């Protein structure tokens, strides 16, 4: 299993090409490349040219760090057809960047809309018809997270939707911080997913359903807002023994190609301290 750092907490203190050295300094051997304005920004066309990709690859080599996964967030399930078609073009470039970096894993979100779930599902499968031949040709794993405020938020429904693509190259991401939006305990989802689950994000969150749903109060009452955090392990309500125990049970921890990414976003002012804590805690909990 690869333990990776999400460098998002370092976006305000370091440049893109400095991320590999930061990861190495903190004891990580792997990076996950999440959306960044100089590489693949949220929802828009990738901004890295071939020269920048080569520089990024060299920076990793110089630091002894590998990129475990590349994470684009693009509207490939968007119910707006113009946005969906654009996302397909962006995805093709993101795939080429990933291949040129020598990376075999991409992870992402469904990126549709919950209030237009049926149209979003149609858009998702339409996009997969065009992208899947490229994904399979390049030998990539593309793993998908049922993110809060998406057309698929339920963990078991995410598995069904991915299964419908009918490709071993498409799998599941489990983000611990999304646990309380997925409607089933981690172990239930992990057991159902089995080998489909090949990437997890490790960060804690509060259970927004506790205290009669009044742990968080948003106004006006009854609005459709989703709330979660990306806290360090132990600062929220995630059942970590169940989480790590489930991963061990399904063989995730013994898979050399699976990725476990530390993704704490709530403590940028203590980014290095938090990253070191996360790595030590992960190593402790996997034994």
Predicted segments with their positions:
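A short, acidic, flexible beta-alpha connecting loop/helix-capping segment that sits on the rim
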Residues: 10, 259-274
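Glycine-rich, proline-tolerant flexible connector loops at the mouths of alpha/beta enzymes
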Residues: 32-57, 110-116
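Acidic/histidine-rich catalytic cores of soluble enzymes
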Residues: 2-8, 31, 37, 126-237, ...
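Catalytic domains of carbohydrate-active enzymes, especially glycoside hydrolases
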Residues: 17-37, 102
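Active-site acidic/histidine proton-transfer and metal-coordination neighborhood
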Residues: 17, 54, 58-66, 76-172, ...
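Short, acidic/polar
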Residues: 12-23, 85-96, 182-190
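Conserved beta-strand positions in the central sheet of alpha/beta enzyme cores
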Residues: 32, 69-71, 107, 143, ...
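C-terminal helical cap(s) of enzyme catalytic domains, especially alpha/beta-barrels
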Residues: 271-287
């Amino acid at each position: 299993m690869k333990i990776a750092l999400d460098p998002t907490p370092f976006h305000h203190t370091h440049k893109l090409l400095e991320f590999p050295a930061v990861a190495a300094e903190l004891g990580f051997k792997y990076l996950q490349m999440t959306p960044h304005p100089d590489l693949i920004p949220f929802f828009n066309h990738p901004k890295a040219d071939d020269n920048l990709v080569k520089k990024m690859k060299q920076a990793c080599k110089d630091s002894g760090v590998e990129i475990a996964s590349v994470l684009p967030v693009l509207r490939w399930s968007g119910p707006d057809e113009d946005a969906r078609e654009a996302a397909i073009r962006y995805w093709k470039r993101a795939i080429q960047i990933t291949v040129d970096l020598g990376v075999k894993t991409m992870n992402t979100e469904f990126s549709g809309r919950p209030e237009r779930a049926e149209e979003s599902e149609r858009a998702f499968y339409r996009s997969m018809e065009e992208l899947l031949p490229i994904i399979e040709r390049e030998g990539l794993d593309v793993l998908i997270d049922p993110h809060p405020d998406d057309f698929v938020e339920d963990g078991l429904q995410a598995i069904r939707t991915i299964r419908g693509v009918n490709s071993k190259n498409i799998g599941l991401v489990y983000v611990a911080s999304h646990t309380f939006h997925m409607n089933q305990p981690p172990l239930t989802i992990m057991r159902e997913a089995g080998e489909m689950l090949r990437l997890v994000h490790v960060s804690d969150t509060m259970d927004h359903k506790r205290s009669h749903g009044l742990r968080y109060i948003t106004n006006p009452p009854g609005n459709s807002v989703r709330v979660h955090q990306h806290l360090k392990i132990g600062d929220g309500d995630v059942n970590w023994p169940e989480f790590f125990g489930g991963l061990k049970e399904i063989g995730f921890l013994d898979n050399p190609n699976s990725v476990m990414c530390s993704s704490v976003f709530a403590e940028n002012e203590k980014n290095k301290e938090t990253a070191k804590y996360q790595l030590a805690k992960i190593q402790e909990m996997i034994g």
